[in-house]
């Protein structure tokens, strides 16, 4: 009963998110990484420098209290070599750089604080910068998913431009969607050993809203570039079905030991064909719900079995 209630809650959130997407204007927004209440980044890089600075003069202290019109120049940061930098203008920019650098160390350390610390050190920062983030790896995983979605969007946008210029042939919808899902899933391959753990973290209650936002935005992008112009109930069902296909194929991929994940792509092609052959009837709505429940329940069971394993079957 608890699992059913959890799935119902997730489905409710997915439905609400699809409704929000449907009401967006044509200019589509991109989900941003949810900000956290970070400790100031200046403390990691300039604490020693501040200790050595002389006290401000009274004129300086007066100017600092005059409001935004008397803004101070941006702080200068000192890396471990003692050289000054002005690269990091805000904590969000520093966060983005650290998480991007940390992805290189995920294959060795997983979605952990150790990977983030290594990423910080690769930028010349103290490993203590990892304390800016939570200990469960959520920010790193969500950052990775956001980056992958942005890369996919760029690929689809470039292809659309080539088609519009007559330099590429427009593909059929089923082929386009299959290739789009495969392109997105292939981005997981360098991290496939640790991806079951990532999915289990994304299923934690506090991570479900941002992860669903990323999923629904991704499938909306796929349908948008596929040329979907539906304005009726099919708008919702198509995106819900594609979300279910993506999730179930992702689970198959984590257990696939065939060369180059051939079994996964065969499974994906069959699911896309099934979806495209659906009739626009009540049976389609029922199949949509079944696909989503199958994907979410399968995720819960599979992740329970896979979490902590370091080798693919």
Curated annotation (Swiss-Prot):
<feature type="region of interest" description="Disordered">
    <location>
        <begin position="44"/>
        <end position="93"/>
    </location>
</feature>
<keyword id="KW-0809">Transit peptide</keyword>
<feature type="modified residue" description="N6-acetyllysine">
    <location>
        <position position="170"/>
    </location>
</feature>
<keyword id="KW-0832">Ubl conjugation</keyword>
<feature type="modified residue" description="Phosphoserine">
    <location>
        <position position="81"/>
    </location>
</feature>
<feature type="compositionally biased region" description="Low complexity">
    <location>
        <begin position="52"/>
        <end position="66"/>
    </location>
</feature>
<dbReference type="InterPro" id="IPR048674">
    <property type="entry name" value="COQ9_HTH"/>
</dbReference>
<dbReference type="GO" id="GO:0005743">
    <property type="term" value="C:mitochondrial inner membrane"/>
</dbReference>
<feature type="compositionally biased region" description="Acidic residues">
    <location>
        <begin position="81"/>
        <end position="92"/>
    </location>
</feature>
<comment type="pathway">
    <text>Cofactor biosynthesis; ubiquinone biosynthesis.</text>
</comment>
<keyword id="KW-0831">Ubiquinone biosynthesis</keyword>
<dbReference type="GO" id="GO:0019840">
    <property type="term" value="F:isoprenoid binding"/>
</dbReference>
<keyword id="KW-0496">Mitochondrion</keyword>
<keyword id="KW-0597">Phosphoprotein</keyword>
<protein>
    <recommendedName>
        <fullName>Ubiquinone biosynthesis protein COQ9, mitochondrial</fullName>
    </recommendedName>
</protein>
<dbReference type="GO" id="GO:0005739">
    <property type="term" value="C:mitochondrion"/>
</dbReference>
<keyword id="KW-0446">Lipid-binding</keyword>
<feature type="binding site">
    <location>
        <position position="239"/>
    </location>
    <ligand>
        <name>a 1,2-diacylglycero-3-phosphoethanolamine</name>
    </ligand>
</feature>
<dbReference type="InterPro" id="IPR013718">
    <property type="entry name" value="COQ9_C"/>
</dbReference>
<comment type="subunit">
    <text>Homodimer. Heterodimer; two heterodimers of COQ7:COQ9 come together on the same side of the lipid pseudo-bilayer and form a curved tetramer with a hydrophobic surface suitable for membrane interaction. These two tetramers assemble into a soluble octamer with a pseudo-bilayer of lipids captured within. Interacts with COQ7; this interaction allows ubiquinone (CoQ) isoprene intermediates presentation to COQ7 and facilitates the COQ7-mediated hydroxylase step.</text>
</comment>
<dbReference type="Pfam" id="PF08511">
    <property type="entry name" value="COQ9"/>
</dbReference>
<comment type="function">
    <text>Membrane-associated protein that warps the membrane surface to access and bind aromatic isoprenes with high specificity, including ubiquinone (CoQ) isoprene intermediates and presents them directly to COQ7, therefore facilitating the COQ7-mediated hydroxylase step. Participates in the biosynthesis of coenzyme Q, also named ubiquinone, an essential lipid-soluble electron transporter for aerobic cellular respiration.</text>
</comment>
<dbReference type="GO" id="GO:0006744">
    <property type="term" value="P:ubiquinone biosynthetic process"/>
</dbReference>
<dbReference type="InterPro" id="IPR012762">
    <property type="entry name" value="Ubiq_biosynth_COQ9"/>
</dbReference>
<feature type="transit peptide" description="Mitochondrion">
    <location>
        <begin position="1"/>
        <end position="45"/>
    </location>
</feature>
<dbReference type="GO" id="GO:0110142">
    <property type="term" value="C:ubiquinone biosynthesis complex"/>
</dbReference>
<dbReference type="GO" id="GO:0008289">
    <property type="term" value="F:lipid binding"/>
</dbReference>
<dbReference type="GO" id="GO:0008047">
    <property type="term" value="F:enzyme activator activity"/>
</dbReference>
<dbReference type="GO" id="GO:0042803">
    <property type="term" value="F:protein homodimerization activity"/>
</dbReference>
<feature type="short sequence motif" description="SIFI-degron">
    <location>
        <begin position="17"/>
        <end position="32"/>
    </location>
</feature>
<comment type="similarity">
    <text>Belongs to the COQ9 family.</text>
</comment>
<keyword id="KW-0007">Acetylation</keyword>
<dbReference type="GO" id="GO:0006120">
    <property type="term" value="P:mitochondrial electron transport, NADH to ubiquinone"/>
</dbReference>
<dbReference type="Pfam" id="PF21392">
    <property type="entry name" value="COQ9_N"/>
</dbReference>
């Amino acid at each position: 009963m608890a699992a059913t209630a959890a799935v119902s809650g997730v489905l409710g959130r997915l439905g609400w998110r699809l409704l929000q997407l449907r009401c967006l204007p044509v200019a589509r927004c991109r989900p941003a990484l949810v900000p956290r209440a970070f400790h100031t980044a200046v403390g990691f890089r300039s604490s020693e420098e501040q200790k050595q600075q002389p006290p401000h003069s009274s004129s300086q202290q007066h100017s600092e209290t005059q409001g935004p019109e008397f803004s101070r120049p941006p702080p200068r940061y000192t890396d471990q070599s003692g050289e000054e930098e002005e690269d990091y203008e805000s904590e969000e920019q520093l966060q983005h750089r650290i998480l991007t650098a940390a992805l290189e160390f995920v294959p060795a350390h997983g979605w952990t604080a150790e990977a983030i610390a290594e990423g910080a050190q690769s930028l010349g920062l103290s490993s203590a910068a990892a304390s800016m983030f939570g200990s469960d790896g959520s920010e790193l995983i969500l950052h990775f998913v956001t980056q992958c979605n942005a890369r996919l969007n760029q690929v689809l946008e470039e292809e659309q431009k080539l088609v519009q210029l007559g330099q590429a042939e427009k593909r059929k919808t089923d082929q386009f969607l299959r290739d789009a899902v495969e392109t997105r899933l292939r981005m997981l391959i360098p991290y496939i050993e640790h991806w079951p753990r990532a999915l289990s973290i994304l299923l934690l209650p506090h991570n479900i809203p941002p992860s669903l936002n990323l999923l629904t935005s991704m499938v909306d992008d796929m349908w948008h570039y596929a040329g979907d112009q539906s304005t009726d109930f099919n708008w919702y069902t198509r995106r819900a079905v594609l979300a279910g296909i993506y999730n179930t194929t992702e689970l198959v991929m984590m257990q696939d030991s065939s060369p180059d994940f051939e079994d996964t792509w065969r499974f994906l092609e069959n699911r896309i064909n099934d979806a495209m052959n659906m009739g626009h009837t009540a049976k389609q709505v029922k199949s949509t719900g079944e696909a989503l429940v199958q994907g979410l329940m399968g995720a819960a069971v599979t992740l329970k079995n896979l979490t902590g394993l370091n080798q693919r079957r």
